[in-house]
A protein has these predicted regions:
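Residues located in well-ordered beta-strands
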Residues: 69, 81, 95-97, 139-143
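Short glycine-rich loop/turn motifs that provide flexible caps or phosphate-binding loops at active sites
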Residues: 61, 67, 86, 95, ...
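Generic secondary-structure boundary/loop-capping signal
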Residues: 10, 17-19, 44-47, 64, ...
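Non-catalytic connector elements of ABC transporters
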Residues: 89, 100-201
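C-terminal boundary and immediately downstream tail of ABC-type ATPase nucleotide-binding domains
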Residues: 75-99, 124, 185
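ABC ATPase nucleotide-binding domains
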Residues: 1-81
Length: 201
């Protein structure tokens, strides 16, 4: 009916059931590509944001925390808020101290983290950036298990009760009560200044 220069979408899929939401998400993306009209899509659903956006703005209390492509924001979150919002399951956060280029937590250390900063930090590790290892840094006991076929979402505890999540391939057999030793995939973690919540690495 009209030929606007921009479309504004305000959570158009929020009241749909899961299957219809996926179908409509694909249809919106196809139509947008076909028509070539700039579109602004507001959503609280990070899957919608990641799959629909060419450029993504993560907003916290009216302030843009980060602007970039979905992959840039997933791989290089600039704050604890962004890191926790993008990614499902959510990134794991562990309190630590950075002292003389060594990251020190209650249960493990990470050496050779080159930084001029010394003080309290938060280490962020995505559940998919872990792998089983006899020489791993992180020990968890499986408390909850979500078996999705293609992968397993495994929940346990570290540091005397802090919840921790690990995503494993679906062909790995895991049972409740199993004890797992995990290592962080090389350099696949974030370090945030605890006072400012901003990224250090």
């Amino acid at each position: 009916v009209r030929n606007p220069k921009i479309f504004l979408f305000d959570e158009p899929l929020s009241n749909l059931d899961a299957l219809l939401r996926i179908k409509m998400r694909l249809e919106i993306k196809k139509l947008q590509r076909k028509m070539g009209v700039t579109s602004i899509f507001v959503t609280h659903d990070q899957v919608e944001a990641m799959t629909l956006a060419d450029r993504l703005a993560v907003i916290n209390n009216g302030i843009i925390e980060q602007l970039g492509t979905p992959i840039e924001i997933y791989n290089n979150p600039q704050s604890v808020f962004v890191a926790g919002f993008i990614g499902s399951p959510q990134m794991n956060f562990i309190d630590a101290e950075l002292k003389n280029n060594i990251l020190i937590t209650d249960s493990f250390t990470i050496p050779n983290f080159l930084s001029d900063f010394n003080g309290d930090v938060i280490i962020g590790i995505r559940p998919e950036h872990l792998s089983p290892s006899n020489k791993g840094e992180i020990n968890i006991t499986v408390d909850l298990l979500e078996q999705l076929g293609s992968d397993n979402i495994i929940y346990g505890e570290i540091n005397g009760g802090k919840e921790f999540c690990y995503r494993s391939p679906g062909n790995i057999i895991v049972n409740l009560g199993d004890k797992l030793t995990l290592k962080i995939v090389e350099n696949q973690f974030c370090v945030f200044d605890k006072n400012t919540s901003k990224i250090l690495n």
